Amino acid sequence: MHFIVNKSIYFILSFLFIINCGNNNQKVYKQFDTIDISTTQFSQEDESAWNGGPGFEVYAEQLGWETNNNVVSIGSPDAIKGDTITLVGETIMPPTFRNIGKETRSQFLAIMEALAYQQLVVFNYETSKYEPELASHWRIGQDSLTYFFRIDPRAKWSDGRDVTAHDVVATYRLRVDKGHGDPTTYKSWDEDFYEPVVETKYIVSIKAKKKDWGNFGGIAKSYVYPSYYLNKIDGTTFLEKYQYEMMPGSGPYIIDMNLTTQDNNGLVVFSRRKDFWAIDEPSNIGLYNFDVINFIFIDDDNQEIERFFNGDYDIYSVSRAQWWNERFTAEEYPQIKRGLTQRLKVFNFKPTGVSGLSFNTKEWPFDDIEVRKAFSHIWNLDKLMDKLFFNEYVATNSYWPWSKYEHSDNPLQDYNPDKALQLLNEAGWQKNPDDKWLSKNGKIFEIDMYTYTGWDRIHNFLVNDLESIGIKLNLVVIQNTFEKYIQKTFTMHYGGWTGRPIPDPDQMLHSKYADDIDVTNATSMANKTIDSLIEAYETNWNLDERVQIIQQIDSIATREYHYIFGWAAPYGWRGLYQNRFGMPERGLSYGSNRYHKHWGGWANHILLWWSDPEKKELLRQARQSDTMSLPIDRELIDYWNKLSK
């Protein structure tokens, strides 16, 4: 029999529709709260190879589909499956287990999502190529607006059901539902895409509302959830139902709700799925090695350190340069000297995001750009680098620091208190000879800044810098400063955002989010020129021209002074670990803005490392001895020779 190949999937579907007579084999499902669905839901859907079923690979290239059959695992073939790893998740238990909706701007929630769910495809920034995940094949329609994905027929949810095109549709409907309370999500998805179309059981098409070179990546890298749960609820009931629950996922791990608890500051437990559908894929060799991943929560620095050296958990990220250089040394800790605890710094290309002091530009006093500009000359970063940071960090001066997207002529934010005072005087802030504080209209210049316990060591420098020119800064210690920031109930905030290898300025800098809460545009940037440039950036298919556009955006945004830029580490991770682990030669991944196997930052260990039985036994023996020492492993990993570049 001869088939006529046509690039249009619709042509194929209209002529090659084969009735599926069903399967009498019954599946046993785990107990989840589902809606009733017919066991013959897909009985009229064609599962032939031509329409995405098993054997599709034979015809895919003829039909214009793409895939990547040359994915090399970043894991080690020597990795050993089994055992448990325990990390500190955050300072406090997250307010939800959802990663869609309000209160979800959390790196830890992104980790939870990546353990349990999968994206359609994954982008590997090291190779600059897409890699299959839920979708084995993909293609872009001739109109450059329609994107097609073929779900791998082998893909299964953790309860045994098939992953299908219907799941992609249901996930889209959730994302655009305003009831979940996250305007960044529902606005962007509704503005960018029409509702996906189920072409066949395994093939889904998604049409964009405008030509945008970034649309494919936005769709491809989105996580997919099961339709037989989502079809029962809307955005509002999703918030209620899944506040502290997770739907079945297709990923390598599943949350263990029997062990997960909010008691004793909280514990979140994930178990490795022995029935993970892609467990034997060559691209997953050496990955997802731990049977159990525990996340504990500790909100006290001293307790966190004490519990690590007591062996209560396995990986400790050292956040303070002073501690790395003076405290966690062989001279101070016998465990380090004897090799029971290892030091490690990994260099990679994990992208650096914007960070520093940011302002609520909707509120006094930072609704005045001259005041914001003055603050850019008050903060003495050089003193911090020298006195506190041991020159471990590098100052930033861009929304996209150290990348080709950084504008070379961004305004210099140097320490110049005389210039700062001049700008404040011009803005109406004056200080009488007998006064300590600047004042305007009878009101002294006094502001509050929320901070975490222990951060006063850094921010006291700022308190003194501000006091020297007549500004009173009160540090208010709370548990969760980020919540105040994202809700826009702050005056000034120190923090930052995860970097992106490829910029997406829309959510952080477009004015359509300026008046919303729970958005990345927490400083309320609203600049019409930036808006126009963002729109030009999204529709420009020339990479070199896009770089120039982002540089223009960077130049304009930095001159709005919403951020007084801070510092960042030139490496991916610095910390301590119990000496019982094996790891790939690269240590961690290359780097990405999304938490998955290519992440390259904090907690990447749980996907690439493994428990070495021999090392574990030696560690046990050494802990029972006062004199036994273990080999000291390499303290620095620079697999990609970043230091020489």
Per-range role (PLM):
Residues I111-Q118, V122-K129, K221-L287, D291-V292, ...:
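Gly/Pro-rich hinge or "lid" segments in bacterial periplasmic/extracellular proteins
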Residues T86, T164-T171, K201-S205, P252, ...:
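Alpha-helical secondary-structure segments
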Residues D78-I80, T185-G235, K241-Q243, P252-I254, ...:
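Surface-exposed binding/hinge segments that line
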